[in-house]
Amino acid sequence: LCVHFRRDRIAGGLVIQIGSDLFCAIGFISKNILLKALIEPYLSAAKEHGILAPMYLELTTGLRRGELLALRWGDLDVQNRTLSINKSVARQDGKLVISTPKTPNSIRTVLLPEDTVKLLVEEHARHPANPYLFPSPRTGETWDPDGFRRLHDRIIKEIGAEHVRFHDMRHTLDLLFGWACGNRVC
């Protein structure tokens, strides 16, 4: 089994460089990821908690938590199946602040799978007047990133997974991409 990653995503095992920034990890021990067998239970639990759409989007895009929670409906282009990532939410001085993403390279357009777009359109029907893709059920505004993380942590515990931080879901995407591509560079 050979899965291709950027070097910063590999935590151990035999590593072979195959390009300037791509490496093949064989028999590696990755950073914490959500195992493939736990993805369905994770998504089922997310659905029970009312957050299937953001968690599904996370698994198909690997967005940072702040990027995910700052998304607005205007960022989604249904026809072209793209999502514009151009802002992030974070807590500063006790208040939620929406600003530009972590780095200039973080401003990007992401192509979405058709099933992800369909799920997002269904999510929009649940709260059509709200500008946020995933509004907080408490406030109707953007989710507090810490509260969203705590809900993710609760779901991880419910499904019996070893601790997988929300940020680790980005690494899960790398592995899913490797499985979907038949363990080759796609």
Model-derived features: positions:
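C-terminal catalytic core of tyrosine-transesterase DNA break-rejoin enzymes
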Residues: 56, 60-67, 147, 151-156, ...
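Active-site/catalytic core of tyrosine-dependent DNA strand-transfer enzymes
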Residues: 80, 88-91, 113-162
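Generic structural detector for well-ordered beta-strands
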Residues: 84, 109-111
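Short, flexible, glycine-rich and Lys/Arg-enriched loop motifs at helix boundaries
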Residues: 87-105
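N-terminal core-binding DNA-recognition domain of tyrosine site-specific recombinases/integrases
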Residues: 1, 9-11, 28, 140-147, ...
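Short, polar N-cap/turn motifs at the start of nucleic acid-interacting alpha helices
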Residues: 75-82, 162, 181-186
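N-terminal DNA-binding recognition helix of tyrosine site-specific recombinases/integrases
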Residues: 1-13, 19, 64-66
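Basic, Lys/Arg- and aromatic-enriched nucleic-acid-binding interface segment
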Residues: 22-73, 78-79, 90, 106-107, ...
